[in-house]
Amino acid sequence: MRLAIAKLHAQLADKRLDFLHKLSTKLARVYQLIVLENLNVSGLLKNWRLARAIAQQGWSIFKGLVDFKCQKYLRGFREISRWEPTSQVCSICGYRWGKLDLSVRKVRCINCGVNHDRDVNAARNIEQIGCSRPAPQQARDLPYPRSP
């Protein structure tokens, strides 16, 4: 019985890793720049209601794979701080409405009147922040030295 359960867990882990490899490869091939939010996964795991779902997603593995494949395919990769108020700001007008309870999924901006899905609005804000800031210089971004 233990071996059967261990085998099932190994199969799930293999399927998850295969999915993460395929997704990260597709993203790195299609997009010139990928921007991710640097989430505090260990802090999120302290919420017992979300812990199992978060732990099973393999976010840190996904981030590492995306970073590696962006280097491989010469794409841009940026992380923005977890302290950016991505779900607290209207992606259209920039109005900041403040912290929202996690149960609130839809928001109407009182400044411009646009209805937002919380996750879509946060994704747009992450994109805007990532595209507006210059990328840190990395070895792959530097020109090759010229020989005399």
Model-derived regions: residue spans:
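Substrate-contacting helices/loops that form the catalytic groove of nucleic-acid
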Residues: 1-63, 133-148
